[in-house]
Amino acid sequence: MEKHLLVAVGDEYASSLSLRYVYGFFSRRDDVKLTLFYVSPKTPSHAAAATGQGQDPPRCRVGDAAALPALEKAKSWLLDMGFPKANVFTKTCRSDQGVVKDIIKECEAGLYDAAVLGRRGLSWFDEMFTDSVSHKILWEAVGFPIWVCRNPDQNRKDVLVCLDGSPQCLRVADHAGFILAGEPAHDITLLNIRAEDSADPGPVFAKAKEILAENGVAPGRVRTRTVTSPNPSQAILKLAKTENYAAVAIGRTGDRPQALMEHIVGSTSLKLLRKLEGAALWLCK
């Protein structure tokens, strides 16, 4: 089944990390649609329009690659790398609510299968952890997967899907299955980090395998692994590095905004977000 990803593009070189990751990850590029999305800052004319002093131009435009060197350069690079021209789209949007909120708004409106952010995307995430309102937007209102790419290594393979039995982690398995069903370059490892007295992870693995099979992933492409550790994030980071995984997929929670800071600080997903390099972090709620 065809996948459609939103790839955030910025002016600086670092934003190319998301492009490099997408190129390196997919071997069947005919099955992937990419929308390159650029959020431009507000200009004086936009501000005047917002206050009724001018005509408000369209907030988002499709196909404006020629108007923005960053978009045109990104699109040309992807075409040179083998992505079909018919599968690569460009879209510009003047900032309305701030870059992060504008990306969220576009992803929800466009029904993308994931949003892909590079290093600049990581800095946007860091900003979100300093503001309670932004916390709420990221950890509650975002209903689509987010891929964060920090120094991606194109020689890495396979996806490490972290499971703890929560609904969020089962949705991670569903997302990984959808992305990888028609992508033979990568297999899946289901990982359970457990304490000494934890319950048998067998039922969790069985449910995840069932979800993967429903997505069309052959059983032979799925492995399971159990690690006993009191520090889940450290164990995941070590495994991702030693086994050279291309992606680490993990669920994220945030169902109670009043307890958000207590939940997020020190969470496994936050530690991975800040420390994982070489592999992309796939976050699903």
Regions picked out by a protein language model, each given a short descriptive name:
Residues V22, A74, I103, I137, ...:
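Aromatic/hydrophobic pocket-lining residues that form π-stacking "cages" and hydrophobic walls in ligand
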